[in-house]
Amino acid sequence: MFLGTYTPKLDDKGRLTLPAKFRDALAGGLMVTKGQDHSLAVYPREEFTALARKAAAASRSDPEARAFVRGLAAGTDEQHADAQGRITLSADHRRYAGLSKDCVVIGSVDFLEIWDAQAWQTYVEANEENYSQATGIALGEIV
């Protein structure tokens, strides 16, 4: 499970060091793709494969399903962390997420999200008031 918030730096070559506690779970390879709210999503290869298969099984006659599959496939980069636990983020991914040197990596249970630090702070501030309401929507009667 991917949990927590980390603040790695993006180096001049576009490399980001993944949190040490997640490296074993990502050792079999990982997929970096465009995420929600201009973040990047990082999936273990197996998790991404299941997601991609589910997306591909959607009706090909549905324009929204086709658009999602195209965006997912075209916007994904397969990576393997180096010996120092770094991955290289493509220029397109860095541009999409507006990444500067200061980044935030957050655990999102079954995947990671990579955010520009300022964008993450803005998102958190804008959504603090909605957290209680979102909890009820996401978990319903569980909480």
From Swiss-Prot:
Subcellular location: Cytoplasm, Nucleoid
Keyword Cytoplasm appears in the UniProt entry: yes
Keywords: Cytoplasm, DNA-binding, Repeat, Transcription, Transcription regulation
GO cellular component: cytoplasm; nucleoid
InterPro entries in the record: MraZ (IPR003444), MraZ_C (IPR035644), MraZ_dom (IPR020603), MraZ_N (IPR035642), MraZ_sf (IPR038619), SpoVT-AbrB_dom (IPR007159), SpoVT-AbrB_sf (IPR037914)
NCBIfam families assigned to the protein according to its UniProt record, in alphabetical order: division/cell wall cluster transcriptional repressor MraZ
Protein name, as recorded: Transcriptional regulator MraZ
Source organism of this protein record: Rhodococcus opacus (strain B4)
Gene: mraZ
